[in-house]
Amino acid sequence: MVAVEQSEASRLGPVFDSCRANNRAALIGYLPTGYPDVPASVAAMTALVESGCDIIEVGVPYSDPGMDGPTIARATEAALRGGVRVRDTLAAVEAISIAGGRAVVMTYWNPVLRYGVDAFARDLAAAGGLGLITPDLIPDEAQQWLAASEEHRLDRIFLVAPSSTPERLAATVEASRGFVYAASTMGVTGARDAVSQAAPELVGRVKAVSDIPVGVGLGVRSRAQAAQIAQYADGVIVGSALVTALTEGLPRLRALTGELAAGVRLGMSA
C-alpha cells in the first residue's frame, strides 16, 4: 500500500460539511474547457455556479480520452480543434473562483506531465483551484502528484470502480483527499436511463474503510436520478447531461442544473 502523508486538511471538506449539515448531497458538475469555445465554456461554468452547482469539475480536453463517453469525447474534440490550451483551463478555474464557486480540474495525466507536475499544481492553486481529479492515475504511480498536492494544498481525487480489489480500494481511498470518485458503472462515461445498481455497494465499500466523502458519477441526467444517488452518496456527479444541455444553450444548462440541484435536496421523494 502506498504511504501517504496527510499534512493538510481537505480544501473541499467544508463544502461537504455544509451539505451534510443541510441533509443533502453536493452537486458536482463537469464541463470541458473550450466547448463550444473558451469564452462560452467559461460562461457556462459560471452559470453552473449561479444555478446551484456546489463544485465545478473543469475538464482539460485531451486527444486520447479513453474513459470519456461519446458526448464528452465530441465536445473535447471540438475544443481541441478550436485550439484550447491547458492555460485556458486555469483561466476558467480563476473565473469560477471569482464568481464564488469552487473548482477542481479533471484531467488525464499526460497533459499534467507535459506542463510539469509541480508547475501545474502551483498554477492551479494560484488560480483558486481546490484539487485535481485524475481518472487514469493510480496512487502507486502518483508520487510526484502526492508531493505537489501537499506542497500546494490541493485535494487529490482518485477513482474507484466496482472492479477495484479490496487492497486497491483501500490504497486509493487512503491516498485521496477531498472526496473519492466512485465510477458507478464499468467502462466509459455517459448519461443513461438506469443508474448502476453497483454504485450503492461501491459507496458502502469505501465507507467501510474511511469517512472520506464519496461522489458518484457516470450516468446521471435527471432530477430523479440525482435524488436516488443522494440517498447514499455525499456527492452526485453530472457530466454528459450538462454537456448535452450546453449544446442546446445556456438557458437549458441553467434549467437542468437547477433541476439537479433540487434533486440532491429531495432524496427519494423526487
UniProtKB/Swiss-Prot annotation:
It catalyses: (1S,2R)-1-C-(indol-3-yl)glycerol 3-phosphate + L-serine = D-glyceraldehyde 3-phosphate + L-tryptophan + H2O. It holds the Pfam family Trp_syntA. Its EC number is 4.2.1.20. PROSITE patterns: TRP_SYNTHASE_ALPHA. The keyword Hydrolase does not apply. GO terms for cellular component: cytosol; plasma membrane. Pathway: Amino-acid biosynthesis; L-tryptophan biosynthesis; L-tryptophan from chorismate: step 5/5. It comes from the Bacteria. InterPro entries: Aldolase_TIM, RibuloseP-bd_barrel, Trp_synthase_alpha_AS, Trp_synthase_suA. Keywords: Amino-acid biosynthesis, Aromatic amino acid biosynthesis, Lyase, Tryptophan biosynthesis. One of its GO terms (molecular function) is tryptophan synthase activity. One of its GO terms (biological process) is L-tryptophan biosynthetic process. The active site is at residues 57, 68. NCBIfam families: trpA. PANTHER family: TRYPTOPHAN SYNTHASE ALPHA CHAIN, CHLOROPLASTIC, TRYPTOPHAN SYNTHASE, ALPHA CHAIN. The alpha subunit is responsible for the aldol cleavage of indoleglycerol phosphate to indole and glyceraldehyde 3-phosphate. Was identified as a high-confidence drug target. Tetramer of two alpha and two beta chains. Belongs to the TrpA family. This is Tryptophan synthase alpha chain.
